[in-house]
Amino acid sequence: MKFTTGLSVLLFFVLQVFAEKLTELVVGVTKEPVDCKIKASKGDVVSVHYTGKLRDSGEIFDSSYNRGVPIQFKLGYSQVISGWDQGILGMCIGEGRTLHIPSELGYGSRGAGSVIPPDADLIFETELVDIQREAVDDEL
């Protein structure tokens, strides 16, 4: 049993090291919402808890959970990396998603300081906490 577990762990790390570069955004749902009355759409102000990791090493580089405050941004207005604008779109409050973001939709060839190297593919574990939508006046 220990041998099988050890072999599985080794195989996991080998696959991570030799994994090909991502060419497109890959989104996986990790937590279904209990009820979905509203889905995040362009122009909504969303609040998202997240943990960000480098895909190659699995190293965590940032987490809103450590600060106890989710990030808040206007969806679809380039206030965050493109992979987030695309990956959060259509989420429901309480939904969890894993975003596998290619470098082109992340920080690209410039990276992000000493935290994210150039051309790094990223993985974000996300949970949509809130959606604020501007009310539409139905009365004319």
Curated annotation (Swiss-Prot):
Subcellular location: Endoplasmic reticulum
Keyword Repeat (UniProt): no
GO BP terms: chaperone-mediated protein folding
Primary location class: endoplasmic reticulum
Gene: FPR2
The protein, known as: FK506-binding protein 2
Molecular function terms, GO-annotated: peptidyl-prolyl cis-trans isomerase activity
Keyword Lipid biosynthesis belongs to the record: no
